[in-house]
Curated annotation (Swiss-Prot):
The protein's name: Hyaluronidase-4
pH effects: Optimum pH is 4.5-5 (for chondroitin sulfate hydrolase activity).
Active site, per annotation: 147
Activity under varying temperature: Optimum temperature is 37 degrees Celsius.
Gene: HYAL4
Free-text function comment from the UniProt entry: Endo-hyaluronidase that degrades hyaluronan to smaller oligosaccharide fragments. Also has chondroitin sulfate hydrolase activity, The best substrate being the galactosaminidic linkage in the sequence of a trisulfated tetrasaccharide.
């Protein structure tokens, strides 16, 4: 454990600290210096992978246009007829009886989680899992995409307010003498309890049925930093939303992976706001990944898109690839998932455009980042961990030095990386990145076999001193209160 010197402690705590405070400080320091190890990668010990989750198989079927997707070790189509894929996404109509309201207010499966039999839902969900994931040894990504309501009452705003309105009506219809205050309280409690049970038991069933699969909910966690057009936009997650994410510990404890999303807007193209938006969303997910009852950090797979939210067929610029995919890799994500819908395959022209992008800017950048992550893992972490930024907010990336490497593209869209890292390249990596060791390994370079009662993960860098100080001071003040 790394211990602060007496002088450093004086910078943090300037008043006398009681014995109980010192004990709390000890445990805080121990928890920081012993971060949870990373779960072993799902594919050939690759520290960072790119997954493909778009229906581009239709390009071959409809237009005889084949995309070279060899750079994606994990591939799946979101189409309903697709089965047995190593990326399986469950929309509302593919997993049990998810309750929701249409935009016209028509209830589907009861509309509210309070109105549906959980047992009946789970029985149908079990059938759906067996249909869409027939292999019992499935070890891919299992993503549940349920977006109509959120399990926390306070987060059901705007169009989702219908779930609060209907929950209130459900309570008021039960008795005429219930006060407005009681209606609000009971509506909130019954909705949240039902929503929690619905989501928790569903993912529990998935993990029980396919225990090797990386089960998680799409868009969880969310940072809710969508005010990207605000003056002086920082990208940071609002404090209330961070606290609400903390309250979802039951969801993180139930999950096997996290699937945040960083879809961005063309109207912000190449701007610092896209970088800020992505950076804080991924960082929040990395924070949540260590807050569970698991003895390892949950793997984070970041959903992104080929194009922009406001212009889906206008594909990401080179800078925005860095601000999304590059940020995800540098912050320690296990991979990215590139999602697309049927618009990508609506015409031969669209398919051709996708093929050109994959075989040029996108493919080249993915080859660059994934190889750089491998090089860093091999040389800094002995292939027993992945590299993450020492300072999470620093502008450092897992990129190959063009003076040392060359990326060649073949005519059919396959990429080959040639070259070798120089001593200077490795020194730069060592200065800017540290190792997040996989389960079973520890030490600065992850060479040591983890002992039963030892620590593993990331050792705090000198730049973490301010964070340590703030935590120490906060703990002292809380005890004094």
């Amino acid at each position: 454990m790394k211990v602060l010197s007496e002088g450093q402690l004086k910078l943090c705590v300037v008043q006398p600290v009681h014995l109980t405070s010192w004990l709390l400080i000890f445990f805080i320091l121990k928890s920081i210096s012993c971060l949870k190890p990373a779960r072993l990668p799902i594919y050939q010990r690759k520290p960072f992978i790119a997954a493909w989750n778009a229906p581009t198989d239709q390009c071959l079927i409809k237009y005889n246009l084949r995309l070279n997707l060899k750079m994606f070790p994990v591939i799946g189509s979101p189409l309903a007829k697709a089965r047995g894929q190593n990326v399986t996404i469950f929309y509302v109509n593919r997993l049990g009886y998810y309750p929701w309201y249409t935009s016209q207010g028509v209830p589907i499966n009861g509309g509210l989680p309070q109105n549906i039999s959980l047992q009946v839902h789970l029985e149908k969900a079990d059938q759906d899992i067996n249909y869409y994931i027939p292999a019992e040894d499935f070890s891919g990504l299992a993503v549940i995409d349920w977006e109509y309501w959120r399990p926390q009452w306070a987060r059901n705003w705007n169009s989702k307010d219908v779930y609060r309105q209907k929950s209130r009506k459900l309570i008021s219809d039960m008795g005429k003498n219930v006060s407005a205050t009681d209606i609000e309280y009971l509506a909130k409690v019954t909705f949240e309890e039902s929503a929690k049970a619905f989501m928790k038991e569903t993912i529990k069933l998935g993990i029980k049925s396919r225990p090797k699969g990386l089960w998680g909910y799409y868009l969880y966690p969310d940072c809710h930093n969508y005010n990207v057009y605000a003056p002086n936009y920082s990208g940071s997650c609002p404090e209330d939303e961070v606290l609400r994410n903390n309250e979802l510990s039951w969801l993180w404890n139930s999950s096997a992976a996290l699937y945040p999303s960083i879809g961005v807007w063309k109207s912000l193209g190449d701007s610092e706001n896209i970088l800020r938006f992505s950076k804080f969303r991924v960082h929040e997910s990395m924070r949540i990944s260590t807050m569970t009852s698991h003895d390892y950090a949950l793997p984070v797979f970041v959903y992104t898109r080929l194009g922009y939210r406001d212009e889906p067929l206008f594909f990401l610029s080179k800078q925005d690839l860095v601000s999304t995919i590059g940020e995800s890799a540098a912050l320690g994500a296990a991979g990215i998932v590139i999602w697309g819908d049927m618009n990508l395959t609506a015409s031969k022209a669209n398919c051709t455009k996708v093929k050109q992008f994959v075989s040029s800017d996108l493919g080249s950048y993915i080859a660059n980042v994934t190889r750089a992550a491998e090089v860093c893992s091999l040389h800094l972490c002995r292939n027993n961990g992945r590299c993450i930024r020492k300072m999470w907010n620093a502008p450092s990336y897992l990129h190959l030095n063009p003076a040392s490497y060359h990326i060649e593209a073949s005519e059919d869209g396959e990429f080959t990386v040639k070259g070798k890292a120089s001593d200077t390249d490795l020194a730069v990596m060592a200065d800017t990145f540290s190792c997040h060791c996989y389960q079973g390994y520890e030490g600065a370079d992850c060479r040591e076999i983890k002992t039963a009662d030892g620590c593993s993960g990331v050792s705090p860098s000198p730049g973490s001193l301010m964070t340590l100080c703030l935590l120490l001071l906060a703990s002292y003040r809380s005890i004094q209160l």
